[in-house]
Design a protein with these regions (language model features):
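Hydrophobic alpha-helical transmembrane segments of ABC transporter permease domains
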Residues: 96, 100, 108, 144-189, ...
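Membrane-integrated ABC transporters
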Residues: 1-49, 64-85, 100-104, 108, ...
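Juxtamembrane helix-loop junctions of ABC transporter transmembrane domains
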Residues: 9-16, 40, 48-64, 88-136, ...
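Transmembrane helix-loop-helix hairpins at lipid-water interfaces of multipass membrane proteins
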Residues: 33-96, 176-181, 283, 290-302
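Transmembrane helices of ABC transporter permease
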Residues: 30, 34-44, 159-210, 283-303, ...
């Protein structure tokens, strides 16, 4: 029920700077016009929001001058002029905000859609080894938790941080413009807020990253338990299952609690420090004005009440922006962690393709095999040579293994010196206990894994020279664990060959013995299947799987324990379908029920990755060796 997992910790994490750079670079590639417009809108909005303090100082100065001179007529025009300018800037800021928020919404959702497409497309190019070593729940987490974390970062946090940074820069410049001494007082006070943010925010961020990883672990565990729920109930392991889930669930609770504990502690501290700074600035401003301390500024203006009031306003503004940065840190950290995992998936090495021999439709003209532009039902290997010539070799289904060694992990060989020969049309059966290497051999035939030593030839061609897509089209497979997709019965059969007509699919279903039960379904071949065809019996699902393989009409078939999980009566029905499928084509069969392989042309007995016996059923019984012991029940396959 469990599978070997290869966690992301086995791959080095990218530096934070590189992750952010790569994220922004990809956003720019996706939206080279809209992204800069949206970001420019955020910058303009920030600048517009920083200007009120300047206009407030001007208006207060004008009113102060009016009080001194008593000439309201000239002051009135200046006040309304500044108010009008301020209102204009507010309108510009509002429009910039609309452009920024709407633009970033489009960029964010569009980028996530493109990332999901890239991830899914790349996932189709990954080798089977990747899926054999990663939990389904962990893979699903890429598309849910990690993408959602990126959404928060790109759509909200990064624009807010850009906006906040511009506001802080503008406010600091304005502060120094009016009073360098007061600006340094403010910056010193807010440096304390920076220290609090660094310490508490850093601890909070680390725990948020752990929360994200542990959430993926919980999802993977739930997925695994859902897939194995029947096994849990068969062995009455409900209590142990609950205990194992509680352990990982408790871990999630602890890291999530710590993350929120630090985050919830940080914000009150920052708010109170901001309030304290406001009081400090007010007191220091009063001292400056009362003692008439000489002001040092870029403007050359004295430090008056007209400067003190906007300075207090800027202090509030500065404090609010520091709080805003602190509140976005966790979102950015989680977004970076999510982006790191997404990029790890995108950076996973794709399945290599060094083959150049392809599979083509063929026809014979004047005794020569030539490529056909239409489906002929006759296949040939197209073998291009270095001199520009092309050789067409008819596909016969001649499969040979020469001294093959293989191991899933370096230094751990599971197949030793495997040599066998399947003539065209022969039925070769693999027999042996679990772990003997039966399924591993079939994984090598279709190059889900590559051999370490030896050779495998298909119609005399080294399979390393055949393109994997062509090789797999020439190999049909019926697995014990049937996978049916959401769609009609017809769609699921057609999955074997996407250009198959409805008539081709019905013909394949009849060959597999599935036509009768399909026509009894509510909508026949157009009946919708969902949840892996859960409304069908195991035998019916298996028959559809056989029909899917039949419509592909490959010259070589692999039947991997295709009847081991169904009852004897259903097996007889399925067996008839498989017999029809195997007729006149090379077939490799793996079965736990030896009765299904009695009529095999060659039976290969495997033990710990080695061939220990081979021959026909009668020949092996006469030897009274391992096969004899298995057949008579002295040995068990499982």
């Amino acid at each position: 029920m469990s599978r070997t997992t290869e966690t992301n910790n086995t791959r080095p994490k990218l530096p934070v700077g590189k992750i952010l750079t790569r994220t922004i670079k990809m956003l720019w590639e996706f939206y080279p016009v809209l992204l800069p417009i949206a970001l420019l809108g955020a910058v303009i909005q920030a600048i517009m929001q920083s200007l009120p303090s300047v206009f407030l100082e001007r208006i207060l100065s004008i009113i102060s001058n009016f009080i001194d001179s008593g000439d309201w007529s000239s002051a009135e025009g200046l006040v309304f002029q500044n108010v009008a300018l301020l209102a204009t800037f507010y309108v510009i800021g509002l429009l910039a905000n609309i452009i920024s928020t709407q633009g970033m919404a489009i960029v964010t959702q569009g980028a996530l859609q493109k990332w999901r497409s890239k991830m899914f497309s790349h996932m189709q190019d990954l080798p089977i080894r990747y899926f054999d070593t990663h939990l389904n729940g962990d893979i699903m987490s890429y598309y849910t938790n990690d993408i959602d974390a990126m959404r928060q970062m790109i759509g909200t946090s990064l624009p807010n941080l850009l906006f906040t940074s511009v506001v802080i820069i503008a406010v600091v410049f304005i502060m120094f413009y009016y009073s360098a001494l007061m600006a340094m007082v403010v910056l010193f006070g807010f440096s304390l807020m920076g220290l609090a943010t660094k310490n508490l925010g850093g601890k909070s961020a680390k725990n948020f990253v752990k929360t994200q990883k542990t959430t993926a672990d919980v999802e993977g565990h739930i997925q695994e338990m859902m897939n194995g729920e029947k096994v849990v109930k068969v062995f009455s392991h409900e209590a142990e299952t609950i205990e194992s889930f509680d352990k990982i669930n408790d871990e999630l609770m602890v890291v999530a609690r710590n993350a929120n504990l630090y985050a919830n502690t940080l914000m009150p501290i920052l708010n109170n420090l901001g309030n304290i700074m406001y009081v400090v600035v007010a007191v220091v401003s009063g001292v400056f004005i009362t003692l008439n301390i000489q002001n040092v500024s870029l403007s050359g203006l004295p430090f008056t009440i007209a400067v003190a009031v906007p300075f207090l306003n800027m202090t509030r503004q500065f404090s609010a922006q520091i709080n805003q940065i602190s509140s976005q840190i966790n979102s950015v950290v989680m977004g970076i962690a999510g982006a790191n995992r997404v990029f790890e998936l995108l950076d996973e090495p794709a399945e290599t393709e060094e083959g150049y021999v392809t599979l083509v439709n063929a026809e014979t003209i004047d005794g020569k095999v030539q490529e056909a532009e239409y489906r002929t039902g006759y296949w040939a290997w197209k073998y291009p040579h270095s001199d520009g010539t092309v050789t067409y070799t008819p596909v016969k289904g001649d499969v040979r293994l020469f001294d093959v060694d293989f191991g899933y992990e370096p230094g751990h060989t599971v197949l030793h010196d495997i040599s066998l020969y399947a003539k065209p049309g022969q039925k070769v059966a693999f027999v042996g206990a679990t772990g003997a290497g039966k399924t591993t051999i079939t994984n090598l035939l279709n190059r889900f894994y590559d051999i370490e030593d030896g050779k495998i030839r298909y119609d005399g061609i080294n399979i390393n020279k055949i393109r994997k897509s062509a090789l797999r089209r020439a190999l049909g497979i019926v697995l014990q664990d049937v996978n049916l997709f959401t769609g009609t019965v017809l769609d699921n059969i057609r999955y074997g060959r996407l250009d198959a007509t409805d008539e081709d699919c019905v013909k394949a279903a009849k060959l597999a013995g599935a036509d009768d039960f399909i026509r009894r379904l509510p909508e026949g071949y157009h009946t919708m299947l969902k949840d892996n065809g859960s409304a069908l019996s195991q035998g019916q699902r298996q028959l559809i799987s056989i029909a899917r393989a039949a419509v592909a009409d490959p010259p070589v078939m692999i039947l991997d324990e295709a009847t081991s999980s169904i009852d004897t009566r259903t097996e007889a029905i399925v067996q008839r379908g498989m017999d029809a499928l195997m007729y006149d084509r090379t077939t490799f069969v793996i079965a736990h029920r030896l009765s299904t392989v009695r009529n095999a042309d060659v039976i290969v007995v495997l033990d710990h990755g080695r061939i220990i016996e081979r021959g026909t059923h009668d020949e092996l019984l006469a030897k009274r060796g391992t096969y004899y012991q298995l057949y008579t029940g002295a040995f068990e396959l499982e």
